[in-house]
Amino acid sequence: MNGTEGPYFYVPMVNTSGIVRSPYEYPQYYLVNPAAYAALGAYMFLLILVGFPINFLTLYVTIEHKKLRTPLNYILLNLAVADLFMVFGGFTTTMYTSMHGYFVLGRLGCNIEGFFATLGGEIALWSLVVLAIERWVVVCKPISNFRFGENHAIMGLAFTWLMALACAAPPLVGWSRYIPEGMQCSCGIDYYTRAEGFNNESFVIYMFICHFSIPLLVVFFCYGRLLCAVKEAAAAQQESETTQRAEREVTRMVIMMVIAFLVCWLPYASVAWWIFTHQGSDFGPVFMTIPAFFAKSSSIYNPMIYICLNKQFRHCMITTLCCGKNPFEEEEGASTASKTEASSVSSSSVSPA
């Protein structure tokens, strides 16, 4: 094995020289230069600095403006809540441990950080599944006269949390475990060892099939059908131009969220799967650290997508920030009006975020 396994940790360095120490008790500066830990701490501080205000603003603006409280937005707000969980439960912990060069908060801190990081990522993924199904049902109309309403949105919220907890909670109760990974200052699922009594192999296979592959297959199926339906509707001119435009804007926004999720999480998932299927192979601490910390940036991309692609949300946000006045009122007004009109013409979910 090209690493050192100990109680609740795996350090990617063979302990031939005797310098490997527990990441819960000693700085891990023998793995990489101390400056790298300072850089990770600064990166986490940046994510907190951006992630908290932008997600809090998303929640506040939606609560403040009644016209944004649509069933579809319940799912989008769910993402903001999950991102805030990641910021407070995960990012603050990782920033603190990076500044010390090891997981100074011990096993409890590792469980907290690993749990919130996994929970946030899974809520994001299953929220995208619910959004994809909603888009498919609204645009493709496999169920005639179906209208996505408040009850459906609440059921969707409950579903995302149930599925996310089904992935994040088992390592807390003995099915697999959370251990420090990479440079040993952030925690994740144990892909690295076959530790006796934890059944890591069965959990990792379960997680990759039920909580990664199947959700992505559902998303790809829904959007494959959706793109075909949009082209057919445009060719047949079955709906008004205003409704079609609103449908396209919502669909484009959600597709961008799916792409952003894949960009953030696919490298981490790929590296984790490689480590799991090549246990004992030689790899450095940075090999897992870079994709793991890159995945954490997912907490800021969803609200940025709302702001960039959703004119109605952007209009409400500017109004809130400018104390009830929008200096770009004339420019934004027409777009907002068209969105409101589209919302009344089509399904209640047509008006995005």
Curated annotation (Swiss-Prot):
Q: Name one GO biological process term.
A: G protein-coupled opsin signaling pathway
Give the positions annotated as glycosylation sites. 2, 15, 200
What ranges are annotated Extracellular (topological domains)?
1-36, 97-110, 174-202, 275-286
Does the record carry Phosphoprotein as a key word?
Answer: yes
Post-translational modification (record): Phosphorylated on some or all of the serine and threonine residues present in the C-terminal region.
What ranges does the Cytoplasmic topological domain annotation cover?
62-73, 134-152, 225-252, 309-353
Compositional bias ranges of the Low complexity kind: 334-353
Q: Does the keyword Heme apply?
A: no
Q: Name one GO cellular component term.
A: photoreceptor disc membrane
Note the topology in the membrane.
Multi-pass membrane protein
What are the annotated disulfide bridges?
110-187
Specify where the region named Disordered lies, as residue ranges.
Answer: 331-353
Where located? Answer: Membrane; Cell projection, Cilium, Photoreceptor outer segment
Source organism superkingdom:
Eukaryota
Q: N6-(retinylidene)lysine: which positions carry it?
A: 296
Residue window of motif 'Ionic lock' involved in activated form stabilization: 134-136
Q: Which Pfam families match?
A: 7tm_1, Rhodopsin_N
- Segments spanning the bilayer are 37-61, 74-96, 111-133, 153-173, 203-224, 253-274, 287-308
Q: Name one GO molecular function term.
A: G protein-coupled photoreceptor activity
Q: Which InterPro entries match?
A: GPCR_opsins (IPR050125), GPCR_Rhodpsn (IPR000276), GPCR_Rhodpsn_7TM (IPR017452), Opsin (IPR001760), Retinal_BS (IPR027430), Rhodopsin (IPR000732), Rhodopsin_N (IPR019477)
Q: Provide the lipid-modification sites (S-palmitoyl cysteine).
A: 322-323
Function, as annotated: Photoreceptor required for image-forming vision at low light intensity. While most salt water fish species use retinal as chromophore, most freshwater fish use 3-dehydroretinal, or a mixture of retinal and 3-dehydroretinal. Light-induced isomerization of 11-cis to all-trans retinal triggers a conformational change that activates signaling via G-proteins. Subsequent receptor phosphorylation mediates displacement of the bound G-protein alpha subunit by arrestin and terminates signaling.
The family this protein is said to belong to: Belongs to the G-protein coupled receptor 1 family. Opsin subfamily.
- Provide the protein name: Rhodopsin
UniProt organism field: Diplodus vulgaris (Common two-banded seabream)
Gene for this chain: rho
